[in-house]
Structures are given as structure tokens and as C-alpha cells.
Amino acid sequence: MVSERRFFKRAADRFVTIRRRRLHHKNKGAAWEDAMLDTPSQSAEDVRLQSFSVTYEYPVVFTRDAFALGNRCLVDALSRREPCKRHRCLICVDEGVLASLPDLASQIENYAAAHAGSIDVVGLVPVAGGEICKNDPKTIPNLLEILSQRAIDRHSFVIAVGGGAVLDAVGYASTIFHRGVRHIRFPTTVLAQDDSGVGVKNAVNLFGLKNLIGTFAPPWAIINDSAFVDVLPPREKRAGMAEAVKVALIRDGKFFEWLEAHSDALARFSRPHLDHLIKGCAELHMRQIRLGGDPFEIGSARPLDFGHWSAHKLEQLTKNQLNHGEAVAIGIALDTRYSVLSGRLAAGEDDRVVGLLQRLGFDLWHDKLRQCDSRGLPVVLKGLADFREHLGGELTVTLLAAVGRGVEVHEMDDRIVRNCIDWLEQRA
């Protein structure tokens, strides 16, 4: 085997040879292509650099009562590139959503009938909601079997209606079936509408690790229907607020100030305020994906994962007794305190952040933060190693330089983390 250094040296030598020949032939009027063809190869390697880019475009729609007969959001999404076609659709619906909205299935059927010129529904499939569907090893094979049985092809649509876990599982199955079929998301939780549902990731859990297998594949469209939020229990409405606090802290100080000013209304789940939170949070996540320079996370930085290294571990340690938003709220508090103790964030800003989270109704302590390993170290610290492995490359954690401005760091001091845990316990 040729060593990596030797390989690149040969490639560089070949480039120099071609460059010299190009200059020589240019004086004689010879074409560059001729010089390329005439250049004798001095090695067995022949290197070609392939480069191309792909532009993605998908609408994110904010609406209400998307399956009302007069609402054209879904029809328009299906038809935006092929307006005169009848589109084959398989619809997968979160079982929890079907239980909360018993008339939803008939509404979908009536909607499809009213727009039969554009929609051909070939099935409505219930899918177990929550982390159950991401943990169950049968979920993806079962979905793939259904896609095959219903003759879904690369011009068909798979429509997922549900919380973030269902969107993740159905999205993953869709993106690996036939190397990717078109999928449309209907997020039904605050967490999915303002964060995960507007992104480009799909994943399920494996070997006890969160999102271990998955894909980066933008959806065809996202339709955020505020009517789904109305029927959520308070705990689920609150969970999505953690992601709004997170993205405000790392990207938009003005949005954080708005959250502070309206925390009482948000804690009461005022519909106008909750709608504003969802839109503001979703737009900031979309901006990061669009302008952050790394939508498919090829590098090591994950600014949108502020507070998540410990959150993912807490979800695992509590066997999902903490939902994602509750774990993220604790993670935000932990990393904000760390930002202060490490000298990056002004003193007192941690109190400000924790105060907002508590006014929104979050409990910022769980006894699993105190669970230690055989060396006496908090088990939650293992979340840093898991986080680095999931990201690849060097450890990169987002902390705060100011409210509204995140900063990347590449190491975390165990002693400071333990001090942060002590601080949270004292405030519990």
C-alpha cells in the first residue's frame, strides 16, 4: 500500500508536470486538454477531483387547521413542482395524535377526497409515538415493509404527522427506501414545530445511544399546524420552550429578552405568545441551518446543541422519565453556570437564565445528576465522551460569551462541572 504522504506527493508532482507542460504548449497555441492527454504518468495513481453542489429548497408553512377542506397548504406543497399531477401519498400518524384527535383520520380522508385531483392516499398508518418508536428495532423494518407493500416510489410522498420521534423514524425510513423518497412533515408538538421538525436530520436510537443511526435529508415541505398544539398536555407544551431559550441564548439576545418579558403568559400557554415563540424559534433554527455554513454537520461544531451533551445523557440515565425538553432545560442551566465559572459569561447571567427557565415551569434538578461511577465521578460526565463520539473529531461544546452569543470550546473541566451540579442542587 502506498502511504498517504507518498500518494499526495505523487499527485502534487503530477500537477507540477502538467502545469509546466501547459505553459510550454500555451506558447505554441496548444490546448490545455492536449497537454493533459500527452502528459506521461509517472505513477499508477490518476487523480480526478470531483466537485459539485446541490441546492435544497423547501417551504416551512405556519397555518391552522391544515386538513380543513379549504386549506390548500398540503395541496400546494405536493404540487409545487408538478402542479398537474395526482400525487401518491402514504400518511403515517402518531398514535398519540390519533388518540387526542379521534376525528383526524376521517378529516384526512375527507381532505384527500376533496382534493382527489392532486392527492391519492394509499394508506394511513398509525405509528407508536415518543421514544418508543425510536428505540424499537422493529419500527424501521416495519415501515420499510409498508412502503414496499404500498408501492411507494421516488415520486411518491410519505407524510409524517406527529411528534419529533415519529418524524425522525418515518423520515429515516423514507430517506433510506429507494435511496430516498419525498417526505413531508406535519410536526404536532411545540418541540417539533420550533426545532427538530424544521431541520434536515432523521435518526433512530440503537445500542442505547440516542440518534446513533440516521441521515441528513431535507424534507419536501414542513407544515406547522397550530391546532395540533392546542390539544397537547401542559408538560408537552412546556418542553418545546427549552429549545427557544437555547437558540435565543446562542443567537438572539432580543428574542431572549422577549421570552423574559412574556414568561408569565408563556407559562399560562397563551396561544398568541406560544405561536410567536414557535415561529421565532423555528426561524432562528432555519437561519442557522441556512447560513451557518455546515447544514449537514461535516465539521465538529454543533451550536444548536447548546446544553445537549448532558441532556442526552440524562434522558438515557432516567430512561426517558425526563423528556427531551426537560433534559435540555437542565443542560442549559448547567452550561450557563459553567460559562460563568469559566470566566466567559458575566456573573449574574446564570441567575437570569435559570430564573427564566423556572418561571416557564421547568424543574432544573434530577437525582441522576448525583449518580457516580466507580471512580466517584458523576456518570453524566460520560455524556461528553458520547457527545464527542457522535460529533466526530475533537470535542466541541457551545458555551456562552454573552446572552445571544455562543462560543465554541474544546475541553470541559470535570471539577467545574461538579461545581455546576452542586449549584443546581442548592437551587432546587
Task: Describe every region a protein language model picked out.
Residues 10, 14, 22-25, 35:
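Short, low-complexity intrinsically disordered segments enriched in A/P/G/S/L with frequent Arg
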